[in-house]
């Protein structure tokens, strides 16, 4: 069959802005949650909360919208986390890139599973990332650090994930079907 050149209307500015907003939403929400967690409120465990929010956001969006959570975007979120946090530069970047890699690698299996299994896998990934961050920080600062903050970070991440996943799932569903939002 012969293909005839057709006339296609140009995409409107509103349509292009809508597509850009949908594409950037996962990165923007993760960055905004990271900034909100970094506000100086004087809460105990606020550094662990900040790292937990970044881990949960990157894991969730890498699992359910990997096209919008590219490694470069994860790198920039990790750089923001390093600039806002207390760890040596590069620790947050490396841990978030590894979390992203695990989520993308296991995506096909995990997206078909129930929430409890995804939560369990996230808790294991968050615990591994916390141990990695603790170890890298100890090596880069040449000090043996107490393991308590790493344990607290893993527990906060595991406890925070259901609430964040609920909010991010609602946002994800409204992105997928804007007419029902």
Predicted features and spans:
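Terminal, non-globular segments
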Residues: 1-181
């Amino acid at each position: 069959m012969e293909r005839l050149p057709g006339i296609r209307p140009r995409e409107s500015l509103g349509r292009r802005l809508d597509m850009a907003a949908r594409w950037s939403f996962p990165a923007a929400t993760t960055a905004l949650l990271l900034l909100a967690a970094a506000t100086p409120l004087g809460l105990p465990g606020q550094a662990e909360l900040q790292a937990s929010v970044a881990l949960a956001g990157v894991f969730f969006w890498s699992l359910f919208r990997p096209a919008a959570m590219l490694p470069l975007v994860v790198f920039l979120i990790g750089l923001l986390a390093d600039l806002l946090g207390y760890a040596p530069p590069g620790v947050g970047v490396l841990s978030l890139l590894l979390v992203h890699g695990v989520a993308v690698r296991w995506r096909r299996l995990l997206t078909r599973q129930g929430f409890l299994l995804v939560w369990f896998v996230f808790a294991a990934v968050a615990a591994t990332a916390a141990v990695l961050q603790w170890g890298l920080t100890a090596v880069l600062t040449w000090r043996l650090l107490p393991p308590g903050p790493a344990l607290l970070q893993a527990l906060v991440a595991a406890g925070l994930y259901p609430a964040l996943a609920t909010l991010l799932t609602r946002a994800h569903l409204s992105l997928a079907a804007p007419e029902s939002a």
